[in-house]
Amino acid sequence: MIFWLRSVIVTFGRPAEWPRCLRHLCSRGAAMDLGPMRKTYRGDPEAFEETHLTSLDPVKQFAAWFEEAVQCPDIMEANAMCLATCTRDGKPSARMVLLKGFGKDGFRFFTNFESRKGKELDSNPFASLVFYWEPLHRQVRVEGPVKKLPEEEAECYFHSRPKSSQIGAVVSHQSSVIPDREYLRKKNKELEQLYQEQEVPKPKYWGGYILYPQVMEFWQGQTNRLHDRIVFRRGLLTGDSPLGPMTHRGEEDWVYERLAP
């Protein structure tokens, strides 16, 4: 940890190792200046140029980067993503979830329909996904409309999960207020006994969504903060539509551009 005190930078380790006066300041809500916290990213020779695109189809480009993330030993969950949703009156919320499949038709994830994200997607069926692979200094952002997956697909995936996860989905009415953790333990134990010798039925309030990508942005970090940003968006379907001088035609109905960092 770095703490600014009268223009002197003082560096500390874990909170338990901080001086008592600093722990007191933090507990009192003192402002923390995190300005000096920064990491070295890539150098200019490793810049992400347009010629480095694996494909002019952004879903295929995502697949290439995703595979690199999967193969990277320092990335524990390459399919972890931040899912951002929003109420109809503009109040956003975000949380980490797991990507469970992707292809030309979209990006799949599963959750509880009665959760906050489920309710927000019901009233405002648009979302944004962000994948951040820190060891590779890469980020991918995906935006688009969201719809529920067919019940058969949700049923199939639900029963492919470990039985403990299936029971967990039945136990937890996600985002509802509960008295304590013991409440979950007790209910979980009851259902483990109930379904010991039988299949766990998928709750009606649990299922999947698919986000159809309309915008996909690929970001790669540079140490000098002149980061690389190449964004794909769905353009006009007519092949003879004129493009701007800095807009390039991708595959099918995609166009792409470089954005200032």
Curated annotation (Swiss-Prot):
Name the EC number(s): 1.4.3.5
Q: Which cofactor does it need?
A: FMN
Which pathway does UniProt place it in?
Cofactor metabolism; pyridoxal 5'-phosphate salvage; pyridoxal 5'-phosphate from pyridoxamine 5'-phosphate: step 1/1; Cofactor metabolism; pyridoxal 5'-phosphate salvage; pyridoxal 5'-phosphate from pyridoxine 5'-phosphate: step 1/1
User: Binding of FMN: at which residues?
Assistant: R95, M96, V97, L98, F110, T111, R116, K117, Q139, Q174, S175, W219, R229
InterPro entries for this protein: Pyridox_Oxase (IPR000659), Pyridox_Oxase_CS (IPR019740), Pyridox_Oxase_N (IPR011576), Pyridoxamine_oxidase_dimer_C (IPR019576), Split_barrel_FMN-bd (IPR012349)
Provide the function of this protein.
Catalyzes the oxidation of either pyridoxine 5'-phosphate (PNP) or pyridoxamine 5'-phosphate (PMP) into pyridoxal 5'-phosphate (PLP).
Q: What is this protein called?
A: Pyridoxine-5'-phosphate oxidase
